[in-house]
Amino acid sequence: MNDDIMRKPPARRLGQQAFVLRHSPDGQDELHVLLVDPVYRDGYTLPGGSAEADELPHLAARRHLETETGLALPLRTILTVDYMARHQYPEGINFVYAGGVVTPRQAKAVNLHRPPPNIRALHWIPRHLLDTVMPSNQALRVHDAWDAWEHGAGRPLLLRGTPVPVR
């Protein structure tokens, strides 16, 4: 499905991504963000993809997160919005949703999850390494989402003026 969207994308992509953290498995208090290594581009990115026609944006983010990582998390808080002018891909707007900090059990399940063929691998990356594993625009997006998450600056997605329910 993602390959079709990349070959015949809509006029303006509406990207939906999830920002999910875990605590360092070595017992330190350092947080790591969940990233995917897609086959269709260089560098890692947040889990996510385009919303289908008439698909609610937060549910598109959840669908991509679950398909790519096995996690089914409620996603309703937007941490950042990133406009991308047409370049290698069509013009798009990317919404990043807060997935929160997963439990050790959830993190282990992600590590055991077999991603779909369009994802090479899943990685938990500490913040200080983001710039080494992601294209600069992607790393800037994740840094901005991380800052918003740390400061509680997210905003709920509204559907006709009403915050979406947590599901």
Where are these regions (language model features)?
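Acidic, metal-coordinating catalytic segment for phosphate/diphosphate chemistry
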Residues: M1-Q17, H23-P25
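Conserved beta-strand and immediately adjacent loop positions that scaffold enzyme active sites
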Residues: Q17, H32, A121
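Residue-level recognition of beta-strand microenvironments
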Residues: H23, I78-Y83
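Short, solvent-exposed loop/turn segments that connect beta-strands within catalytic domains
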Residues: H23-L31, Q88-P90
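Short, acidic/hydrophobic/Gly-rich beta-strand patch recurrent on exposed beta strands
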Residues: L35-D37
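Nudix hydrolase/Nudix homology domain
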Residues: D42-Y44, R114-R167
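Thr-Gly-centered strand-to-loop micro-motif
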Residues: L46-G48
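Unchanged
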Residues: A51-P74, D82-Q138
